[in-house]
Amino acid sequence: MPKILTFKKRRDFLRVAKGFYVATHNMVLQATRSLSDDCDFFVGYTATKKIGNAVVRNLSKRRLRSLVHENLQEYGLNYVDYVFIAKKTTHSCDFEELKKDIIYAIKKINKNFLQNSENNETIERVTDEQKQSN
């Protein structure tokens, strides 16, 4: 099963910001092709100061992190890096609504990648067989 690894460097966040993005009511998802040859997922979480104090920012990131770990392996594409950006409503919205937003955004990004990819073979969905073999 592919691991979900997190970004640590600012340059990684800036690189992903140049790719595709999808904005929903409660969050923004940015994605770009991964530079890594591993089939692991690389993910970043961001919450700016304009959404609230440290408690609100950390709560927003915790909620995003929880739902991403729950849904990314099922809906995400291999060789794609994701950055989830919290909005002011992320910490207070219904958990199921946030889950729907995350799934919608991931599917929308996947559609963009598959349509705009020059070589569709380099982006593969993680199949159940691949998950079980790892």
Sequence positions of predicted segments:
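Positively charged, solvent-exposed patches that mediate nucleic-acid binding
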Residues: 1-134
